[in-house]
Amino acid sequence: TFLTPEENNHVTSLWGKVNVEKVGGEALGRLLVVYPWTQRFFESFGDLSSPDAIMGNPKVKAHGKKVLTAFSEGLHHLDNLKGTFAQLSELHCDKLHVDPQNFKLLGNVLVIVLAHHFGNDFSPQTQAAFQKVVTGVANALAHKYH
């Protein structure tokens, strides 16, 4: 794994407290609000007309949970992120044509949401460890683009 044992401990101890549904929905919602061009991939999700509409949209929340569930699975396979995310990379690259930069943006938004939810428990060391993880996941998801 690319994390030190200490970094891995920071990630796993915090992740055990994460509400995947709540954090996932908020992270995806914030991505769509902060980076509005990402909305074009979610036109079938209904009302994305305002920040309130996006944050309250049940399809955004459901897909956010799905995204974070996959991310959670990746945390169990940090030594093989490319393999773990190969099918999702293929789907997002070949079928959905998602700009791989969006994976990095979502990772950064996830770090912000975790900091927001956990406050003082989200130490600089924890942030650094999570930043490594979201970068690794983003790179794995972008793998099929190379």
From Swiss-Prot:
Recorded GO CC terms: blood microparticle; haptoglobin-hemoglobin complex; hemoglobin complex
Keyword set includes Heme: yes
Gene Ontology terms for molecular function: haptoglobin binding; heme binding; hemoglobin alpha binding; metal ion binding; organic acid binding; oxygen binding; oxygen carrier activity; peroxidase activity
Record keywords, A-Z: Acetylation, Heme, Iron, Metal-binding, Oxygen transport, Phosphoprotein, S-nitrosylation, Transport
Tissues/organs with expression: Red blood cells.
Domain Globin: from-to ranges: 2-146
UniProt modified residues of type N6-acetyllysine: 59, 82, 144
Record-linked PROSITE patterns: GLOBIN
Function: Involved in oxygen transport from the lung to the various peripheral tissues.
Quaternary structure, from the entry: Heterotetramer of two alpha chains and two beta chains.
Protein's UniProt name: Hemoglobin subunit beta
